[in-house]
A protein has these predicted regions:
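Short, Lys/Arg-enriched, disordered terminal segments
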Residues: 1-3, 75-78
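Thiol-based oxidoreductase modules, predominantly thioredoxin-like and allied folds used
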Residues: 31-42
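A short, hydrophobic beta-strand/beta-hairpin element that forms part of a small beta-sheet core
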Residues: 53-60
Length: 78
């Protein structure tokens, strides 16, 4: 089963949209999702703070800012 990790920040509107899109295909495509708030994790906040949401699939960066759902599904299926 694939694992999706989303770096997010409190109050991030783009993060909410990305999470909703990813969750909309979660049951159909059968993958795990973890959402990690990076607000108080200095090294992650410094590295990714301006790029959230950051989406990883199986520990590899998939996307920043917005989710292209078609590409996401393609990558989840491979």
């Amino acid at each position: 089963m694939k694992k999706v990790l989303i770096y997010s920040r409190t109050g991030c509107h783009l993060c909410e949209i990305a999470i909703d899109k990813i969750n909309s295909v979660r049951n159909e495509k059968n993958f795990q999702v973890e959402i990690k708030l990076i607000d108080r994790i200095h090294d992650l906040e410094e590295k990714y703070g301006e790029q959230v949401p950051v989406i990883f699939i199986d520990e590899k960066i998939h996307d920043y800012w917005r989710v292209d759902l078609e590409r996401f599904i393609k990558d989840i299926n491979t």
